[in-house]
Regions:
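Soluble, non-membrane globular domain cores that form compact, hydrophobic packing
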Residues: 1-131
Length: 131
């Protein structure tokens, strides 16, 4: 069974951006706690269960950049949860821009969702290095 990644979602999110310079980061990047009220904005459905989740998005509407960490509940079916996310996320949720790179993957009970452009490979690489 795959090891779960320990630590707060905020700390993990910070690690995902390691090695990316300030200039490369989207403007006005902020972390938003995901709740049952706002989850649809980030994962495309409110019909989803999770322990906790955190999004990192630009507050500028024309920047296609959304990184979401979802921690599954104890004993939850990770593959089913990933499938729900894959079927519902919307890389076109920004009015005039589209995220070209979409990634949904997990390590243990932690799911990473990337909808982004050139930063996607670096963020995914950082996720793969987490332990």
């Amino acid at each position: 069974k795959e090891q779960n990644i320990e630590g707060s979602l905020e700390d993990i999110m910070t690690k995902l951006y390691e090695g990316i310079s300030e200039e490369e980061l989207p403007m006005a990047l902020s972390n938003i706690e995901i709740t049952s009220e706002n989850v649809e904005n980030y994962l495309g459905t409110s019909d989803i269960e999770f322990e906790s989740a955190l999004a990192s998005e630009s507050m500028v509407g024309s920047i296609a950049h959304s990184i979401v960490l979802v921690r599954a509940k104890e004993g939850q079916d990770i593959e089913a949860l990933k499938k729900t996310i894959e079927e519902n996320i919307n890389p076109n949720k920004w009015i005039c821009v589209t995220a070209e790179n979409v990634v949904v993957k997990n390590k243990g009970n932690l799911i990473l969702v990337i909808m982004a452009n050139e930063l996607a490979p670096k963020i995914e690489e950082n996720f793969d290095k987490l332990s």
